[in-house]
Amino acid sequence: SIMIYKSDLLKDCVGEADLIIANIVADVIIRLVPELDAHLKENGRFLCSGVLVTREKDVTQALEEAGYKILERREDGEWCAILAARKEERP
């Protein structure tokens, strides 16, 4: 089943999801990255969009430093989307 939450980042979300989607600016995505592990299932994916191409490197760096692997990126004009997953299993 699909459950959709509207929340201040992941504040009101409970449990774990297969996919978390965020269509917000880079600074907010970077702030969100440390919270992902608590809400993503093992092998879960994080899809973010609303990222200016000029800020893509900042977002990918934050994800990679948190243990995520970039699976795919798409670009449309000055915007991009990034799909990421955990590089390794959680302890």
At which residue positions do the language-model features occur?
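A short glycine-rich, Lys/Arg-flanked "PGG" loop and its adjoining helix->strand segment in the class I
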Residues: 30-45, 60
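A short SAM/SAH-binding and catalytic strip from SAM-dependent methyltransferases
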Residues: 10, 18-31, 50
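Core SAM-dependent methyltransferase catalytic element
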Residues: 68-91
